[in-house]
Amino acid sequence: MGPQPEQELMGFFSSLGIMTTSEEGRLYPRSLRAESVRDALLNVCDRLGITLICGANVASAHKASEGWALQINRPARALKAKKHDDRKSELRSLRKALADVPRKNEALEARAVIIATGGNPTGIADTFSLPLTSLRPILCPVSATVVGDRAALKTLDGLRVRARLTLTRNHSELWHEDGEVLFRTFGISGVAVFNLSRRIQRGDTILLDVFPDLSKDELLDMLNRRVELLGGFSPRDPRWLDGMLAPQLSRVVCTAFEQCHPGSNDVVHLVSILKHFKLLVEGTAEERSAQVTRGGVSVESISTPSLHACSVVDAPLYVCGEALDIDADCGGFNLAWAWISGIRAASSL
């Protein structure tokens, strides 16, 4: 990324005419609209007379005397799609039109090639004989079940809680993060869960601490004061937890208490449930909406900082962005890598 990537990116965006603003250490276009960045980039391309060929596939690539000889397959005419009021419907129509449009072959010569295909570089990597690591979607929800109560997530569906998530494997802690958790019928979602999805394996355990701001001793003190106020706790009466937890979570917690500590009413055991609510990982979920793909062109096959393909010595070939097997947590890190790596590759031409 370099010694000062933030300053470098701000300078780059400024050179495009994009005004930026900072919020909680994150850089945004001042408009707070992603299309502002897209439009600024397209405007620069237009001013510089850069030709954009959209919807094309690279059918073959061969080294030429000065770079590359490419065969591409492109739409033979402009796309015709039904107009829609909302952008998503319009995009669906355009995708269908792109799939149905007649296509033609065309030869191109290129002094250099930069592969910036995003998360699925399989076809283009094969074309240029680049090694690939396996692909899988990440930064997405996690499929899981509540240990001992497979019906619990149906009860909790749609509930949001602030919690600390701890990922364990073979009784060893691997990772933890605080954040909002959204319960779904298939598992859990939310930004912290998306980050978790980068690290999970089937069979892992997620421990939810629904009182992350309190230590075990502080939570126990609070529960003991509650006993003095309301009387003794009973897992058969979830209403005892009213004012502490959402009713649906209270019911699930009481069920977990009875399963783990049958016959007990001891709030010491309740502390254990509230600080270590267990879910068993089954995998990732809603993968079509994943923000990032893990895997891609192997980083061992790329020279840094130029990002030139090591296996190609006599023709300029570079790989950048998500096409490389590099990924990061939520928070703008993947976008920052896309921008910076694009700048690095282009600067190497």
Functional labels for PLM-detected ranges:
Residues 1-26, 30-51:
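N-terminal Rossmann-like dinucleotide/flavin-binding domain of flavoprotein oxidoreductases
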Residues 2, 8-25, 93-96, 112-116, ...:
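Residue-level recognition of phosphate/Mg2+-coordinating polar/acidic sites
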Residues 24, 321-324:
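Short, histidine-centered active-site or binding-site loop motifs used for metal coordination
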Residues 35-36, 40-246:
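Predominantly flavin-linked oxidoreductase catalytic cores and closely associated redox partners
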Residues 110, 320-321:
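Thr-Gly-centered strand-to-loop micro-motif
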Residues 119, 317, 323:
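Active-site metal-binding loops of divalent metal-dependent hydrolases
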Residues 124-128, 336-349:
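An active-site-proximal "capping" alpha-helix that borders the catalytic cofactor pocket
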